[in-house]
Structures are given as C-alpha cells and as structure tokens.
C-alpha cells in the first residue's frame, strides 16, 4: 500500500517537515546515532523484519544511500551486506576483480549500457526459449555461476534473462545489495532501507 508513502514523499519533495512518529504502516523512522548501530538495525530489517512484513525476499529489499564513499556509503555497505546475506562458502565459487569479490548468489547491477551483450531466457529444462541483445545501466540480477575454466560469470537478471560475462567485462558489474539513491531512480522495490548519518 502506498497510502502513507505518497503524501510523505510529496512533502519531502516540497521541502516540508515530515512527522516521524512511526504511526504509518508504509513509512517509519528508526533513530540511531552511530554508524555501527545504524548498520546493525539495517541488517535486522533486511534479514528478519521486512521480509515478513512486506512478503518479499531479502534480495528484493533494497538499501539506498546518497553516497558511494564513507561509513554508510555504497562501497562499505555492499561489503558488509554481502558478508551478511551471502557469506563465503566452500559450495560457492568466487572471482576477485579489483576491490570486489564476486560470489555465486551475489546481487549485482549492470553499471553501463551494453547493447551488444547477449542474453537468453531458458526453460526449466535449460532450453533456450528466447534470446536477444542488450543489458542496461541499472539492470539487477543474481550471479548463478562462476566458471573459472571458461572465465565467465553467468548472471540471472530480472525476467529470467541469463547473461554470460567474460572476465574482461567485469568492470560493467558491481555488487547491488546497496545502491545510490541516484542509481535507483526509475526502479521499484517492495521495500527500501535508507541508512543515514548526520555529517559533522
């Protein structure tokens, strides 16, 4: 329901003060003053509370932040969220690329348009039932397979589009447990968590 969220978002857009009394079913505010406490409550919301409340998986709940760097920036949050939601396992292959470790089961995002990248949709038996080209900035998916022999990472994007990335194309992917508010524009999620820390 967007009963409370829409009027609140309109007030925010107009620069008006918003009541944070937590009487809304769609919008609530949890006050914490230190980055570590904010991260802990964010993890609890994603893993335990929100999936039950909104009926969505932890992968569908999106963390949004205004910054890339800093204590609550995308880069740090993605590392923490990856460890919490998709920790290392002997059963999951990994590929290190720069400062990022991609792992089977990771939530990832395409970060620039690639009109030549091929995709296909497969039946439950693995047969190709549709194919095309083009993966676009902001598309999100889950890493299905990392194949060191073929040097590829296969990502299952929304609508079941399977895309095989050669290791040479990994600059086009980043972890997507947390994304910037700017990057999320135009996307829809069943729930979002926005961890914020007041500046000096």
Language model features with spans:
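Conserved nucleotide-binding/hydrolysis modules and their immediate coupling elements
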Residues: 79-83, 87-200
């Amino acid at each position: 329901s967007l009963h409370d969220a829409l009027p609140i978002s309109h007030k925010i857009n107009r620069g008006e003060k918003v009541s944070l009394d937590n009487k809304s079913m769609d919008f609530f505010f949890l006050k914490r003053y230190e980055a570590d406490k904010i991260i802990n409550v964010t993890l609890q919301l994603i893993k335990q509370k929100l999936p039950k409340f909104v009926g969505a998986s932890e992968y569908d709940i999106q963390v949004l932040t205004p910054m890339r760097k800093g204590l609550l920036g995308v880069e740090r949050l993605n590392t923490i969220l990856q460890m919490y939601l998709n920790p290392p396992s002997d059963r999951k292959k990994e590929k290190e690329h720069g400062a990022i470790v991609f792992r089977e089961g990771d939530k990832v995002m395409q970060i620039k348009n690639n009109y030549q990248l091929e995709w296909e949709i497969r039946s439950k038996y693995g047969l190709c039932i549709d194919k095309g080209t083009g993966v676009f900035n902001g598309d999100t998916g889950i890493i299905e397979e990392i194949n060191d022999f073929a040097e590829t990472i296969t990502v299952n994007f929304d609508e079941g589009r399977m895309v095989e990335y050669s290791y040479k194309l990994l600059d086009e992917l980043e972890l997507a447990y947390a994304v910037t508010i700017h990057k999320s524009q135009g996307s829809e999620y069943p729930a979002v968590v926005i961890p914020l820390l007041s500046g000096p």
